[in-house]
Amino acid sequence: MDDFGRRLLQRLVRRTPAQALKATLGKWERLTVAQRQSVDFTQPKVAVMEQLVAIFEENGWTVKHITELEMINYMENANRGMWHAFQMTDPKDDANAVEMMQFKEQFKSHLSELVRHVSVKIKKHTDEALWIRIAWGDSYSPPNHLKPTYVVHHLQTPYVFVTSLNSKQKPFLVQALILSTGYQGIKDANLSGQKLTAIRDLLMKQYQQIFPSKYNSPLTEKNETVSNPHIEREQSEHASKRLQMACEAFGDGIVPQLQTAVYKLETKFRGDANTNRTMTKREGPFRCLVKFASTNLLESFRECASSGIASTPVSPLLSSITLKGRNYFVVTENGLPSSQT
Amino acid sequence: MKVGDLSVYIDMSLLKPFSKLPALNAATILLVEREERFQQNLADALVGDTTVTVNVRLAKSLPLPMDNEESRPRIDLVVFIINLTSELSLKSAEASLKYLDPGYFLGKVCFLATNARNTSVPTERLDAMRKLAASLHCPLLFAEDQTPDGVNSATERLLTVLKVAAGLVPTATALYLSSLTRCTIPPDIDQPSFE
Amino acid sequence: MLNMEQHRGSAVRTPINGVPVQKRSKSYRLSYGSCLGAASRFGFTPTLTARRFSTTRRVSKLHNVKEKINADQLALLVKMEWKLSYVTPLYQFRHTKLKSYSRQLSVFITAEKQQGLAVDVDRVQNSYRVSFSLVHGMAGTDDAETVLIQVHSKHMFAKKDEPQKLIWSGWLTCMNGNSDYLGSLPKDFICLPLFGSSGPEDLTSLVQSWFKQNFDCCIGPLEISHTSLQWLAALWTNCHNEDNIQHLKLIWSLPVAPPLQITYTVDPQDAWDLWGSVRKGSGAEKVREEEEPGKIIDIDEVMSFMQGLNSHFYKHFRLDLSSGSLKEVATSLGSAKYNGKIKISNSKYMITTLTLLTEGALLKMPI
């Protein structure tokens, strides 16, 4: 194995916890059972590395095989890096009929036409998602396997999730995607996060949603904690209404784990008109950037609303996160829902 | 809406101390807390008292909903729980005060502040709290809400005040007790002083 | 929630009802910091003498510290982010004995670091070099002169001829301390209540314990309170017409589970306009026209400024920032964090900022 292969393998070993590495090797079909069992994961990473190098050299495996391993590893541990969502638009009639083999072939051939040196690997994940690994090169340099772009696409949906893509590469990827799927355009979905599963679930609405209804939902009963006949909540109705509205806006149960939401506000100053007449009458927007951050943003928001820190009904700006599946917003005077004024 | 209607409405929403008859050997306490965090623990501890029947009503703010008017017993003591780390907590209590009949301020209201020792509490807020309690002639208690001991000692104090306020202690009245326990502020709270 | 626990922990460690220090006269045991007594169990403490933050501040624009303070010292002061502590008055501290203090502290640090280690004696003697120096020009009329402390050291495996590197620095200052209070101190005490440090924490605690042992003082962590942070937000914004503040950034934390952090970054010009609109009796233009140095800012103006920012926020998100607490304020002039970290990036506004912090330190002292 050459130096570069060594570096690539070393990086993979170093970045992955021992248990995850073991699982990755278990999923890789190339290893024999004996080979798999011969690796002792309790020893230091350096020693594990040497054992793996020996196995690779014994079999004459190269960079190609290491990238294969890296891909399996990434698919199993998708929650790293920053994932950005894109949405394809203007479907043609055959958009829903694109098959995996057809897509694979077309995507590879289109991309290699667009970029001189590029290495593409496509694999189907257990959840039917297509994983694409792209190592980019250009006319003068071979594909850089140290900085691959990962693309995840669910066939028959307009959504594409991308990580580690720079602006130079973006047009090529967009072009190749459009040519090999049945869509004619692609746009930034303004949604990003560290957890691929979270942004996917949010966009595809794969979480427990509560819809507004006239009747009391099961949530109401959940909220009533009558511990003792002598204790009475005077405003239990308000509380359950708040909880209902909180869940309508941000989902019930386990919600997609988003970390941030960003709002760029370019609206008129909306302070108290009585105390601050000068500002409310002022021409031009009051420009500010508001960033919300939490380990689980939707859960934090839900608690804000159910506990009354956030007034209900929930601000349309906040409920747009789930409603529109976005976490980046530019809010201008025209774009502001009328209920805000 | 006519002016007359409005006054009726305001009148109805006021909580009055003597509009209902007291129940035998029972006392009712209303815990008002914006955050609704400490009140449940406190309520559980309060109803554990064996000498009298304690009824606890929990609210986030005043006024109380009209619908419960019928079923609600006479409230003998109103406690405002204020988390000093939150400005909103104090503001909300202030806003609720105007829904109490003035009769309550003769010994049937008390303030319970939590987190007073937390370093993130600005002195100004503590001052505002003390001034509020002093101006209304109400006692101001400090409580520790995170430990069982803190909850117990707060419970004991509230029970003492509650029993007097409900007229269950033959030798004392609410007004008498409050004249002893009400919060006072030092005369120099507003100006720096170096003796 | 976790944060709160920690803060409470630190509050509990702070003596509440005054440390019994016999040497001190009664006259100032009744002064600063007895506001901490307000945290006593009952709402009434008859002897409570409250000392509060000033409700007005003078913003003098002519702080040409650049001309007064040594350039190297100033460069160091504005380069680092400092972790703040409060220090009670130092007993028998002499500004004339700084050389001897330098020697003593070097020996102290070396000895403490050496404990339990068998090291070459010759080497060890040189391994920590401490220098105390005066910072001229950084004191108000009644204040004691600011003292700068620097610790230099070599790597354990550095070559003989390699120069020692600055590994820790700290300073003790008093900027426009309350003159009544300073005047009430007995002669043997020097008041330098604000202590800033930058460097490894073990060195900070060594330096602090040396001070405690030698000058019979108490040292404890100093948070930058909610009110101080609001003051800084206003004071810095107030400078925007002279020096572009680039942005006004406020970080709030809301007490929900999991905790919600909100970063609110306002365009400098819009922040300035809002500030102008809340200044009493003057629109934004009027303030700009007035060129007289030394303006008075009132706490009410600071509060209306924050109120304005919060209500603009509320109208959009229907989320009440006042239910949480302000954790951090930053502009290009500096940044301040609730946990007691401060960076003053522009020397022009150092005096104003340090005056505010000195006041905070004096309030925090458990005398």
Feature locations, PLM:
Chain B
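Short, flexible boundary segments at extreme N-termini or domain junctions of P-loop NTPases and their
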Residues: 1-40, 45-48, 52, 59-65, ...
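Short linear motifs at secondary-structure transitions and domain/linker junctions
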Residues: 4-8, 52-57, 84-89, 115-116
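Residue-level recognition of the N-termini of beta-strands and the immediately preceding loop/turn
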Residues: 27, 54, 107-109
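WD40-like beta-propeller blades
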Residues: 50-55, 127-131
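A short, aliphatic-rich alpha-helical micro-motif
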Residues: 72-73
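Conserved GTP-binding G-domain of TRAFAC-class P-loop NTPases and closely related GTPase folds
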Residues: 78, 82-87, 91-195
